[in-house]
Amino acid sequence: TDPKEFAHGVEAAALMRQFGCDRDVKSVDECVAIEPALASCRDKLAGGIFTLSDESGDAQRFTTELARMAEGKGVTFRWNMAVESLTFDGDKVTGVRCVNEEHRKEVLAADAYVMALGSYSPFLLKPLGVPCLIYPAKGYSATIAIDGHRGAPMVSLTDLAWKIVFTRLGDRLRVAGTAELSGYSKDLNLVRCEALVRRTFELFPDAGDRESAQFWTGLRPATPSNVPLVGATRYRNLYLDTGHGTLGWTMACGSGRALADLMAGRKPG
């Protein structure tokens, strides 16, 4: 919706095509043909970048199902455990100090350890002297019941001007975005919440039941370069898989597979 942002998007699309990514520049009419819901904001559009291979889904459902499948393969999950610190001896981590759900302390020992605590990773790594430049960037989402309304988009969309995304999840519309630097607080800023809803109905007046909006906030583990920290550390049995920023689910399976290869002594790929 912003000509300058669209121009930047066109430049970024050209760069990504050089690396094999599918990014097609589309006119306003072409955008509306791909997603008819955009007809309600046609006069606000500058153009679009379309990726046929893009997909979207429900990250919570994916994670829940993945855990269920992992349990079926013999993985044991220890829920409601508070992790206090890592123990180490020389260049080797020797255990994880925890408090279990019965409030009893215990130390879990393993052959290898993976630090995958997102924004909270620095708290355990700092005492070990492992560099970990991660800061929490709070993001917001609003989930709106479509409830028979016909104006919600079917195609996943990104508003480059406002840095928010629209994703249809069955009979719900998920709107997410913003970046708030407020430490580890997960309190909802109602001004930001309302901004998401207001922008949604500016673009898609018949998107759903405005009063049904449910809000959520989470902490994105951001690094200065926006590149995640995946790989070995100075400790021979401690590995990192953290700092994925806004692309945690996008990169989850790929970085997990790459790290598994590294831990097994194989070349990732």
Regions found by a protein language model. Give the residues of each.
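Active-site substrate-recognition segment that forms the wall
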Residues: 39, 83-93, 107-236
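Mid-domain beta-loop-alpha active-site segment that forms a flexible
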Residues: 50-67, 119-120, 192-199, 255
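Helical element adjacent to the flavin cofactor pocket in flavoenzyme catalytic cores
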Residues: 7-15, 39-111
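General small-molecule cofactor/ligand-binding pocket signal
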Residues: 24-26, 76-78, 213
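Short, conserved active-site loop motifs that form the nucleotide-linked donor/cofactor pocket
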Residues: 74-76, 173, 238
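C-terminal lid/capping helical subdomain adjacent to the catalytic/cofactor pocket in oxidative enzymes
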Residues: 25, 38, 88-90, 146, ...
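Dinucleotide-binding Rossmann-like beta1-alpha1 core, especially the glycine-rich loop
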Residues: 1-28, 200
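Alpha-helix/helix-capping structural signal
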Residues: 4, 29, 119-120, 254
